[in-house]
Amino acid sequence: MNPTLAGKTKLVDWIARLAAAAIMGQTLFFKFSAAPEAVALFEKLGVEPWGRLATGGFELLAVVLLLVNRTASLGGLLTLGLMGGAVMSHLTVLGIEVEGDGGALFVMAIVTLVAGAITTWLHRAELPIVGARLETQA
């Protein structure tokens, strides 16, 4: 973990990381078990089954990276990419509300995107290649 994180910042960091990991983690069962809801969603996107399984694999990797202090920056970055794709899918193909969920999937994607952004920002100095430059500009 970034040694400069202290007090409330460290708490915000852990809340963001745990929230993102919990939200992505709870969807893994549905993706890997081919739950009808997940299959229907990825069929609508035109990427069933490979898109569902690849997304599940990358989300599992993001969860692990988020929960390990040394890799939190990469987990946050991967979360940003995954949830950016999820939000764009909702805005362009799926719609805000999917199968009568009242927009719950969309809201969870937004919350996870924000949590990933917070994590990435707080751990920006640890990002490979660009981290040192980002830290000096902040």
Regions found by a protein language model. Give the residues of each.
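Extended, low-polarity transmembrane helix blocks
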Residues: 1-27, 70-138
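Solvent-exposed, well-ordered loop and adjacent helix/strand elements within mature globular domains
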Residues: 22, 26-53
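Glutamate identity and glutamate-enriched acidic tracts
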Residues: 37, 43, 48, 59, ...
